[in-house]
Amino acid sequence: MNPQIQVNGQPESLATFTLEALLRTKGVAPGAKGVAVALNGQVVPAGRWPETRLSPGDELEIVRPFSGG
């Protein structure tokens, strides 16, 4: 069984071990403007995404702006 994390409340296999790599799989470019990320309830500044390691059981929240009315 693959290790799991929670991403925006949904279980997901932990296929990569850095925050930046996971965000890339979600279409978030490194250092993307307007994107907020919290890992286990703590905001992670974009400059720390490459060095932030993910572990089984982590809870990740990704907030992105969207257009609409």
Please describe what each predicted stretch is.
Residues M1-G68:
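Ubiquitin-like/PB1-type beta-grasp interaction modules and other compact soluble beta-rich domains
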